[in-house]
């Protein structure tokens, strides 16, 4: 429950800050929280297999997590559909961080996978900083 609540807050806060200069932007729902729970499970069990509906091939969870973050970044940059990509992205960050805080030993167990999963977040932050400057 704590992962859900923190992911909900982080996802909504991220969306609020990302879209604060867009007066007509609106979003509702808890998909950022759900994304945080999913991303938390990906961090805890990176080798579990996940299947996407449009690609019925089992993928390791960490590959799914990386691809999902890249898709969210793409969706944010292109304003794709009526989907809260920013809330999903923020929720994933919240789920990742709270999981690492609650269970820090996972860092030793899966350091390289966690670094791979953090890479899209860092690339997004660098790109965002370049746009601001």
Language model: regions and residue ranges:
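A detector for small-residue-rich transmembrane helices and their helix-helix packing motifs
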Residues: 1-133
């Amino acid at each position: 429950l704590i992962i859900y609540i923190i992911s909900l807050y982080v996802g909504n806060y991220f969306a609020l800050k990302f879209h604060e200069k867009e007066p007509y932007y609106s979003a509702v729902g808890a998909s950022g929280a759900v994304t945080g729970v999913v991303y938390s499970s990906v961090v805890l069990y990176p080798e579990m297999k996940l299947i996407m509906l449009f690609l019925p091939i089992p993928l390791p969870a960490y590959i799914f997590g990386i691809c999902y973050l890249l898709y969210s970044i793409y969706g944010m940059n292109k304003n794709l559909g009526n989907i809260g990509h920013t809330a999903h992205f923020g929720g994933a960050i919240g789920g990742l961080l709270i999981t690492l805080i609650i269970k820090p030993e996972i860092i030793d167990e899966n350091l390289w996978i966690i670094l791979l999963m953090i890479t899209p977040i860092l690339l997004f932050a660098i790109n965002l900083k370049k746009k601001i400057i």
